[in-house]
């Protein structure tokens, strides 16, 4: 096809899913002339699977995105239909906010934000090729022949990259939700020498809400207490008219139908070769893998206020359409349900993430960044977090400024990216709280304290919001100091209160911060018992209470972080030749040469690099032997 020269930009972002939207908005807000290209303008920030945002670890990522100046938290706070805090009976490190989204409102609101953002142009196009000159990415070529040039390019192709949908024996080339797949871009990446692999994900059927017998299901209402993802959202705007979700279960009859039709499932017939997600398996995989279980939970989740579609959560399947309906009709409450869309599996290309740096720039081609599901992750939140970092770094690169990264001790986003680039992934990667060594420091409640200053330095947090943040920090310190001054006396009221908690009496006066360390004692109780009011609002008080109650554990993790930072400060030269280092185990040598860690701390986290290998490497890097092993 004949090509033509179109416009020139500072940054081009390919794909307008959750990663692409954050990347493009970050770049434009940092002052870069940005082009956002998407296969379909009707799919901007679309939710092809679960109509929700947040959950364990993921919810904290959304708060981190917001603290850095990203959009996902604001967007869901404008478009949710239900909000719930999960794990409220557990410690603060694992509490998680989850919102049920109106997926159509979410898409429309994000598209409106993008269209109204200065420096940002949104266009519909399929990108077929990259413009690469002297090992640097300098633009893209679309299927209509347009050549757009740029200083940096961010790819966020999601599941559209050579996507193929499977429904029983039927399979066809497609992106998510029957959109156009991106075929030639994958071929372009392979020609450039990138290693691609196939992953698989899936989605459940959607059913008509009016054909469900809700009397046979369990209601899951939203929280009455105001909750928000964005630190800028106000309690007075909290939605009181929330939409419930509903829970039901599969049963032995459901499992019998699944087992009888496994030969028709592309997951088991061999038609699907892509690796599926461990933590979000299809219902047929769950039935086979957990054959001892008589039932599995199913969540019925509304997709929005203006649609009749209900998402059948935890029921992902690629069975033939008629088998899906037969399966649904065995479930309590769904005996007469009408299916509006069948579930399907989708295979797609991913870039092996060891080919990336911590900035999400590719090692092979300079000024080319990748983010989202094409890096091997699953989930909207993981994608958005990567997109934000890739967009920030694409903008910084366009300006010739130093790159921006987040450490494992600074954010779940840092954990996610570090896991990808130092360990790679053999399956769709899902962020879990257990992946974070310092999760007590990386909480839902303190994301602003960790990251707002960084967002302000990048130009993504405006001065007004930054001033509010500084005022909050001052109030936290003021209330911490105040609790160190207030005395709680052993009054009758105090000891009756303690008896009600099953605790021993107070024999003498103690400072309020010491009293607050007792289990189940709250800041509000201290205020009531002493008659002394603190200055902060409920969010400040929450922070104060956590800081005091968990001070010892937080201190331990801060000591561990100090050790990590010492190791991170020990840089490994880029041109080191691992073949010349004597004593390294073969596996360690191969892994180090493949991943090429930037610091000793990163090398330590690579699977296959043992302590002995690390000690040898450390000697070469730190003790003057490096010159002997230069390439």
Swiss-Prot record:
SMART domains reported in the protein's UniProt record: GIDA_assoc_3 (SM01228)
The keyword ATP-binding is annotated on this UniProt entry: no
UniProt similarity note: Belongs to the MnmG family.
Taxonomic lineage from the root: Bacteria, Bacillati, Bacillota, Bacilli, Lactobacillales
Required co-factors: FAD
Subcellular location: Cytoplasm
Positions with a binding annotation for FAD: 15-20
Name of this chain's protein: tRNA uridine 5-carboxymethylaminomethyl modification enzyme MnmG
Molecular function terms, GO-annotated: flavin adenine dinucleotide binding
Binding partners and assembly: Homodimer. Heterotetramer of two MnmE and two MnmG subunits.
Keyword Flavoprotein attributed: yes
GO BP, one annotated term: tRNA wobble uridine modification
Region of interest: Disordered: 214-233
Residues annotated as transmembrane: none
Keywords (A to Z) from UniProt: Cytoplasm, FAD, Flavoprotein, NAD, tRNA processing
Function recorded in the entry: NAD-binding protein involved in the addition of a carboxymethylaminomethyl (cmnm) group at the wobble position (U34) of certain tRNAs, forming tRNA-cmnm(5)s(2)U34.
